[in-house]
Amino acid sequence: MRGCKGARGVGCGHLGADVPAGRGWARAAPAGARLDRARAIIGVSACTIIELAALELLVSSGVLVVCVGGGGIPVVLDQHQRLHGIEAVIDKDLSAALLATQLDADALLMLTDVPNVEAGWGTPQARPLTDVTADELRMLKFAPGSMAPKIEAACRFIEATGGIAAIGALADAPALLRGDRGTRITAPTSSPPGA
C-alpha cells in the first residue's frame, strides 16, 4: 500500500528532560523552543487501522465516530506478532483518508480553521478554491505541514474511492458536505475509482 515505506522527518518530540548526549538523536525545535528539550522524530503514514472492525461496528450501528485525531498511536508488530509502540508521528490527515477509504465512506471532511483552501495562499494573488478536481489540486503548491497534507489526503481518498472530499471550517461542516461552503474536491469525470 502506498505510504507504508520509508519515513520523513517532521515535528518535534518534546521530552521532560534534557536530550541525552551520545544517543545519536537529531535535534530540532520550533521557533522559541528550547533545543535541549526537543528532538526530531520521524513522521510516517499509517499502513492500516488496527481497530477497523470495531470502528465498522460502531458506524454500522449509527454511532458518529470521531477518531484518528493526531494520526493515531504508531505501533509495529514484532516477530511474535505483538504490537510495540515506536517513536514516530503519524500524519493525521493521511490517517483520516486511509480510515475513510477502509470504511468505504462516501465523503471525507477535513475540518480546519480556514473557510477554504487558497491557491497562492499568503500572496497578493491568493484566491479561494471552491470546486476543484484532485488533478487540479496536484498541480498547485501548498505549505508543507499545513495544507499540503490535507490536499494529499483528499487526493488519495478520491483516487481510491471516487468519493468527494471537502476542506473548510469546523462550523461549516454540514454546508461542506452539501457543497455549499469550503473547498469541494472531486475526481476528474474520466477517472474511475482506484485508477
Language-model segments: which ranges?
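C-terminal catalytic "cap/lid" subdomain
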Residues: 1-195
